[in-house]
Every structure is written in structure tokens, then in C-alpha cells.
């Protein structure tokens, strides 16, 4: 292999490494794990990675401050270079990465030549709303993703191009949203507004209702006291953790039939309608860290239920599952119910209603005098066979490590012998 061939191979692998670093976006967090208390952004800066430009950074047409991989000529990487202004962006660039700099303004001429841009990452800078020239993003007809998280924004950026599909605005100081700010965002599928200063008044006019393709809405860590009104029926993932929501209106979710995941932990929920979560497509439900005193109806397709840190004293299984249909069993597999006020494990009748359950995490419970108690069974696991048991041991992690376990016969519940015991 000649010298030129070796150089080409080297450039290829370097380009793939850089490209993969920025293009591996996740739709959302892993449903198998409890959401972190600290909101996770799409891109995480790693201290042990060298983000400086390689020696061959001066690719034809690339800004001198940045790096344009030869194998990915449409991408320009300008991150972590202590830039105070946006460098010149060539017309052929489609992705520009400017995160972890000291940029304070986005001027009208920032993208004047870069009309082919599909993705802009300006996260982790010092940008204020008044320093964004009006319409600077709206002039980009091909823009699909816009990252502005971890800045100093006070207003929702407006106007934006109707081509936009994903916008990240978490970790700002946004407290205002114009009524017509999102009217033209007909293609938006993901809106991240976590860690801002949004209260009920900001969403009163049902400003989100016209986003007919919206699938993921993140409103965690804001100042909401009630459920946001007028959400689009296309929604599949709704994050409302760490607000001050105390109730959910009757029939609130009737217009959200596609909802797959609902996270409303760390709020002030107390009494909620019995069948409020009767959603046929719901897979994950997190209502932990509230003030709930009793269980509620569990929809048939729900798999993961988080009830930790509430005030539940007794779990009435017949409330969760009023009837048993042998042809259409419930799909529930995991329950987390630690840090409640249980005095005994859940009735074994639960395995007739929910035959697919294989983990119930009881952990510690709160006693009436404020001290913690431990039930005889802290972790209930059901192993279908020896292979499942070995596989679980290989992946044993988290708070369940300290619990005791019970192994049961998966086919016992539902048998004639079981029927005679109830």
C-alpha cells in the first residue's frame, strides 16, 4: 500500500470518529432506568477528549478557526475554541457545530451565505435573546435542528423556519412565548424547554396546539402549577418532571391517544381521577415523588410503573385491575414502589392480573413516626427459567442490589391450584 493510500485511510477513520461524535442523537432516555434528577442534554462535553482542531484543519473553503473533515466536507466543527463571534460559514456547509464557546450574539450576517444549513449547534455559549437579530434563523429554508440549550435566552426565538424538526432550548431563562411564535412550525417533532422559567401564563393561549407533528415535548424543571393546555394529539413523549402540578383534569389525556411515555414525577399530585391514565399506547408512567395516597387503573399495555416516594399505605390490586381477561393480559413488567408507607408486600393477586411482572422494588418504606422500615421482601423478582436468572445476574445493578429476592413459578398464577386460594 502506497503512502497516499495510507493517508486516505487515516483521513477516513478520523472523519468517521468526528462525525459519529456529533451525529449520535437519541430520541429519549432508556425507559428501563429511572430518569436522572439532573436533566441530560443531547451532547455531553467530556473533559478527557481533545476537541482542538487537527493539524490539517485548513480544508478548502473552511473557516480558519474551524475544522472541516475531508470525508465530510459539508460539516464544520468550531466547538470549544473560545470563539466570541460566529466565523464565516461557506455556502456548501450543512452542519455547523459552535458549542462550548463564548459567543454572545447571532447577527443578521452570521449565516448570510450558508442557506444550505440543516443543523446549527450553538449550545453552551453566552447568547441573550436581545442579541439574536430578528429573523436570522428564518432565512435558512433547510434548517432541521437547532441547538440553543445552555445559553441566557429569556424569550422563545422567533421567527423560525417552518422546515425545523427539532429545537433544543433547555437550560435557559425563557419566561415568555409569543402566541404566534410557533404557528409556522408545522414540521416540528421535538421541542425541549426543560430548565427554564415557564409558568402557567406562558401556555394559557394553547400556543402549542398547532404543532400537529410534535411527538416529544420536554417541560421539566419549570414553574408550572397545572397541566399544559391544548397539547397536539400527535404527542408520544411528555416530560413534566420537577414542576408544582397538583392535579390532572378529568379526561385530560383523551386528546393524547398516541402517548407512549409520561413523566410527571417530582410534582405535588395528590388526588387524581381513578382512570386518568387509561391510554391504550402508554408504555412508561412515572408519577414518583408526589403525594399520591392510593393506586389507580393501570392501562393494558403499560410496562414500567414508577410510584416511589409517595404516601401510599395499601395497594388495592382490584383498583389497578378490575377484571382479568385471559385472552388479553396486562403487560406490566416492572413496578417501583419504595419510599411509601406500605406495611406489607402487595397481594399475590397481582400476579393473576399482571402475569408478566418480574420485578417489584419495595426498598425502604416510611413509618408513621417518620423512620424507615424494610419489608420482608425488598425486591421481588420472578425468573421464567434458569437462563433468565443467569442473564439477570449478569446485569444486576442499581438500588436492587441490597434487596432480598423471591423466585416463583410463572405458570402457578392462573392455575386451578391458584384459583382455589383466592
From Swiss-Prot:
Residues 1-20 form the signal peptide. Glycans are attached at residues 113, 121, 187, 242, 278, 316. Keywords: Cell adhesion, Disulfide bond, Extracellular matrix, Glycoprotein, Leucine-rich repeat, Proteoglycan, Repeat, Secreted, Signal, Sulfation. Disulfide bonds join 321-353. Belongs to the small leucine-rich proteoglycan (SLRP) family. SLRP class II subfamily. It comes from Bos taurus (Bovine). Residues 385-422 are annotated as: Disordered. Bone specific (at protein level). Binds the alpha(V)beta(3)-integrin. One of its GO terms (cellular component) is extracellular space. This is Osteomodulin. The modification Sulfotyrosine is found at residues 22, 25, 31, 39, 51, 77, 412-413. The keyword Repeat applies.
